[in-house]
Amino acid sequence: MKLKVTGAGINQVVTLKQDATLNDLIEHINVDVKTMRFGYPPQRINLQGEDASLGQTQLDELGINSGEKITIESSDSNESFSLPPPQPKPKRVLKSTEMSIGGSGENVLSVHPVLDDNSCLFHAIAYGIFKQDSVRDLREMVSKEVLNNPVKFNDAILDKPNKDYAQWILKMESWGGAIEIGIISDALAVAIYVVDIDAVKIEKFNEDKFDNYILILFNGIHYDSLTMNEFKTVFNKNQPESDDVLTAALQLASNLKQTGYSFNTHKAQIKCNTCQMTFVGEREVARHAESTGHVDFGQNR
């Protein structure tokens, strides 16, 4: 897991094992931590007081998941030093690709754009889970799963022979969709919630299997990642913030639809801005992109 730690002279991203404990985190940052704050609503751990016995507790049991921002105070802090009264922060002006979470303005859900190169689904998932590009690894994961389960992923489901599909999805120009989302979600044990801009709804893959989830945004032909405060991408459906995050995601989708950010591939004609050909349906658009390498599309209105 990756955590952003600030305070006590520290401002860094920390990488730990998924089963890391509170002590593992403290040893990694090498600071005599007095207190730490995290989460939404904010939670506080007093390591030199009532919470001193929590050292061997796993971070996820404390509600600290990958992508969390943690603010620490060290024992070396001079508590007697008088700080000037805090000045009110100017109200942040949100961009069209941002939405306040819970209405407080403290947390913001925003679009993290990924490359528009026919691998956008894989880019979006890779950023949401790993914070880095793992497109080739994800494609290989899908290919192996398809080959290993020819009954589940039969020719009728795949719309082509099983072995052909397993080879086809390895090509960087091949578009991914629901099949790939489901396979990757199962393999990485994290639910994937797809925010559909045109339908203004969230399609949840494996929400009954996994508590942790990532959010990816779909405008009809392109996927992007969604992040909280430009860093957190993995959420937990049992955490208090989850409902507010999902509400903000739908509000953001509605706003983006009104600004023409989405494409209705079921009804509207989609135009290739490279060659000016027009298509109806995501499959037609995908086939054209895969055969030509064209990735710049617009909607005829």
Swiss-Prot record:
Site of covalent link Glycyl lysine isopeptide (Lys-Gly) (interchain with G-Cter in ubiquitin): K160
Region (Cys-loop): 114-120
Region (His-loop): 218-222
GO cellular component, one term: nucleus
Single GO molecular function: cysteine-type deubiquitinase activity
Keyword Hydrolase part of the UniProt annotation: yes
The keyword Transmembrane appears for this protein: no
Subcellular location: Cytoplasm; Nucleus
Annotated active site: D117, C120 (nucleophile), H222, H294
Quaternary structure note: Forms a complex composed of CDC48, NPL4, UFD1, DOA1, SHP1 and deubiquitinase OTU1; within the complex interacts with CDC48 and DOA1/UFD3.
Protein name: Ubiquitin thioesterase OTU1
Gene it is expressed from: OTU1
